[in-house]
């Protein structure tokens, strides 16, 4: 996480704004540890952290070679060690050029490469230590209702369950973050209107409800076989499939009307999101391929584009990169749930990764995708100029997310999988809030 902290600090405006305060290296304008201004504090903090992190990388390499780590782990750590001095030299040129674009880009790319090497080494080390160990005995499959407020009348609660409201808060946050980022692209005198926000988020809630309802109808036979889902409204006939389908159509039409009131492209993306989740993911991917989780991440990524397009009327780089963060986060998030309910998914006939590739490989891929998510969050900061709040959030919550993934390797039971699952929600939720606050408030 030391390397990651340096990456984030270098990519956010907290360091970019400080670059002009110190255009020499290794000293700062002929002085050592001159801390007369906040910019200089940031610069020296970055350089001190770089030195300490370099020592940590050296220590990791020595440890890998002296403890008999596997060849691939030694190779990955040695690669990080070899790249680090190159990164320092590029960083020096970046400082002396006041953050000129070519040096900044190379500096960021090398940093991501070092971080990726260390993440891969971590995943392989954990796999070597725990991959051959049996998982803890899973407790009996927990039964619970999928969604809804138990105080609601039965039929109302059943229709609320169809809409999968637990998905709404996070996906609406994704759209909200997309709108916040896009608002920074508006010209002088333009601002994000309340009508755009209400229509976009309202359309998002309705489209999520439509997609969830169609999913209930289309997966009712599989849901009946799974302890986690065999009490869903369509399975238990509280709502007949025909009524649920009609409800989904009404929600879908209403969502498209809300999106169309914003602009036509937003409506097109909304329709794409509904169709992708309901047809491509539910009918084609999930029952047939272990890669359904990865490819299906596109469904969760589309709200980022919807939010951006609602404000600007066109797809932009910031929206695409935010969508990429969500896409890469999805496997790191959902694989935890797939582990927790592996036997249930197997009974339902879904060839998810834990079912067909095993739990050890799934845990390893969680670490891979956490690393990819964190790296993409750095790219988002670099391209959109997000500041210190965003930087602190992705570093601190990213460390928490990674910590629980490591614990999952050690403990290998449902409780650990669900802790990692909730940590993934906390990371993304806080990151999106930080995007909104950093863009709109700070």
From Swiss-Prot:
GO terms for molecular function: protoheme IX farnesyltransferase activity. Converts heme B (protoheme IX) to heme O by substitution of the vinyl group on carbon 2 of heme B porphyrin ring with a hydroxyethyl farnesyl side group. Pathway: Porphyrin-containing compound metabolism; heme O biosynthesis; heme O from protoheme: step 1/1. This is Protoheme IX farnesyltransferase. Its main location: membrane. It comes from Halobacterium salinarum (strain ATCC 700922 / JCM 11081 / NRC-1) (Halobacterium halobium). PANTHER family: PROTOHEME IX FARNESYLTRANSFERASE, MITOCHONDRIAL. The gene is ctaB. CDD domains: PT_UbiA_Cox10 (cd13957). It comes from the Archaea. It is found in: Cell membrane. Residues 168-439 are annotated as: Prenyltransferase. Its EC number is 2.5.1.141. It is an enzyme of class 2 (transferase). The lineage of its organism: Archaea, Methanobacteriati, Methanobacteriota, Stenosarchaea group, Halobacteria. It holds the Pfam family UbiA.
């Amino acid at each position: 996480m030391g390397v990651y902290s340096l990456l984030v600090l270098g990519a956010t405006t907290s360091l970019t704004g400080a670059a002009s305060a110190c255009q020499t290296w290794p000293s700062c304008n002929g002085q050592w540890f001159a801390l007369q201004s906040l910019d200089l504090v940031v610069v020296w903090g970055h350089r001190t952290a770089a030195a300490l992190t370099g020592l940590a990388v050296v220590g990791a390499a020595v440890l890998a070679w002296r403890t008999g780590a596997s060849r691939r782990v030694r190779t990955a750590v040695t690669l990080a060690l070899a790249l680090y001095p190159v990164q320092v030299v590029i960083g020096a040129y970046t400082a002396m050029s006041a953050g000129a674009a070519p040096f900044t880009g190379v500096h960021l790319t090398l940093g991501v490469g070092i971080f990726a090497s260390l993440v891969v080494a971590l995943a392989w080390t954990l796999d070597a230590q725990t991959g051959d160990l049996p998982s803890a005995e899973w407790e009996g499959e927990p039964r619970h209702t999928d969604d809804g407020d138990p105080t609601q009348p039965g039929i109302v609660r059943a229709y609320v369950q169809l809409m999968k409201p637990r998905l709404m808060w996070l996906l609406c946050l994704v759209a909200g973050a997309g709108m916040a980022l896009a608002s920074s692209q508006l010209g002088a005198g333009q601002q994000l209107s309340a009508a755009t926000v209400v229509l976009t988020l309202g359309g998002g809630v309705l489209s999520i409800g439509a997609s969830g309802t169609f999913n209930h109808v289309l997966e009712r036979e599989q849901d009946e076989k799974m302890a986690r889902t065999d009490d869903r409204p369509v399975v238990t006939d509280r709502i007949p499939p025909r009524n649920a389908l009609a409800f989904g159509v009404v929600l879908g039409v209403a969502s498209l009307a809300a999106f169309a009131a914003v602009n036509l492209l937003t409506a097109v993306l909304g329709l794409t999101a509904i169709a992708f989740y309901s047809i491509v993911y539910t009918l084609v991917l999930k029952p047939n391929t272990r890669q359904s989780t990865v490819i299906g991440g596109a469904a969760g990524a589309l709200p980022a584009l919807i939010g951006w397009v609602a404000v600007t009327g066109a797809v932009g780089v910031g929206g695409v990169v935010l969508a990429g963060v969500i896409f890469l986060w999805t496997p790191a998030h959902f694989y935890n749930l797939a582990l927790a309910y592996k036997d249930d998914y197997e009974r339902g006939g879904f060839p998810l990764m834990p079912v067909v590739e095993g739990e050890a490989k799934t845990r390893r891929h969680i670490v891979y995708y956490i690393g990819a998510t964190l790296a993409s969050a750095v790219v988002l900061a670099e391209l959109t100029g997000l500041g210190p709040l965003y930087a602190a959030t992705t570093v601190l919550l990213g460390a928490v997310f990674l910590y629980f993934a490591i614990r999952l390797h050690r403990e290998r039971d449902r409780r650990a999988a669900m802790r990692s699952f909730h940590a993934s929600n906390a990371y993304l939720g806080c990151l999106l809030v930080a995007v909104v606050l950093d863009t709109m408030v700070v």
